[in-house]
Amino acid sequence: MTTSSIEPRNSYKRVMLKLGGEMFGGGKVGIDPDVVDNVARQIAEVAKSGAEIAVVIGGGNFFRGAELQQRGMDRARSDYMGMLGTVMNCLALQDFLGQHGVECRVQTAINMAQVAEPYLPLRAERHLEKGRVVIFGAGMGMPYFSTDTTAAQRALEIGCDVLLMAKAVDGVYSADPRTNPDAELFTEITPKEVIEKSLKVADATAFSLCMDNNMPILVFNLLTDGNIARAVNGERIGTLVQS
């Protein structure tokens, strides 16, 4: 359903921000420092306002396991390569957050003691309570699970109020807005309607996790400066998926 209401949504205290790795590359292989710095600045502004922010980043700017599998590579091995790509993105974001005066911890699902903490949900919650940003790397630590699913699972385990899905479009549309000028933007929609309309919000496993556990999903455009703060503060941007 769409809505014309201008009433603000609830603001959120603890959020999970899911970032696509492709965004970190600026459309290329590797890391675009200008993009990462811009994202870090936006996250830092929100963290300094008192919100608690956890982050999951994809690794698509380095490797995409499913695509490598299509070229004949073993799926599990290619997924592990993708997990390593996510860690590189995590370390880059950690560094830029530090430049903006925000303490940050990286936790990985694969043991990398020299560069990150292991994933420990209770420790992650303590970091958040102390005002630190926590970035989760290496996906779930197992092949066949996407970083969308990681974001949903981590959000549930550490008690986030909402899963913020940062995209390169304004939200969830009735059709692809890049090819259909009549595509309608949904401002609010229920999980049931998402399924009935065959809309793409997150991968099926991540969406099911959120739907089954009543975790709201807010899909919004990361490319609009200040949108992370707007999403956290409850301004009416993007598409809110909730029952």
Curated annotation (Swiss-Prot):
InterPro entries: AceGlu_kinase-like_sf (IPR036393), Asp/Glu/Uridylate_kinase (IPR001048), Uridylate_kinase (IPR011817), Uridylate_kinase_bac (IPR015963)
Keyword Oxidoreductase (UniProt): no
An example molecular function term from Gene Ontology annotations: ATP binding
SUPFAM superfamilies the record matches: Carbamate kinase-like
UniProt-annotated binding residues for UMP: 59, 79, 140-147
Top-rank EC class of the record's enzyme: transferase
CDD domains: AAK_UMPK-PyrH-Ec
Activity regulation field: Inhibited by UTP.
One GO term of the biological process aspect: UDP biosynthetic process
Catalysed reaction, written as an equation: UMP + ATP = UDP + ADP
The protein's annotated pathway: Pyrimidine metabolism; CTP biosynthesis via de novo pathway; UDP from UMP (UMPK route): step 1/1
GO cellular component, one term: cytoplasm
Location relative to the cell: Cytoplasm
Keyword terms: ATP-binding, Cytoplasm, Kinase, Nucleotide-binding, Pyrimidine biosynthesis, Transferase
Binding sites annotated in the UniProt record for ATP: 18-21, 60, 64, 173, 176
Subunit structure: Homohexamer.
Protein family according to the UniProt entry: Belongs to the UMP kinase family.
Protein name per Swiss-Prot or TrEMBL: Uridylate kinase
Native source species: Corynebacterium efficiens (strain DSM 44549 / YS-314 / AJ 12310 / JCM 11189 / NBRC 100395)
Source organism phylogeny: Bacteria, Bacillati, Actinomycetota, Actinomycetes, Mycobacteriales
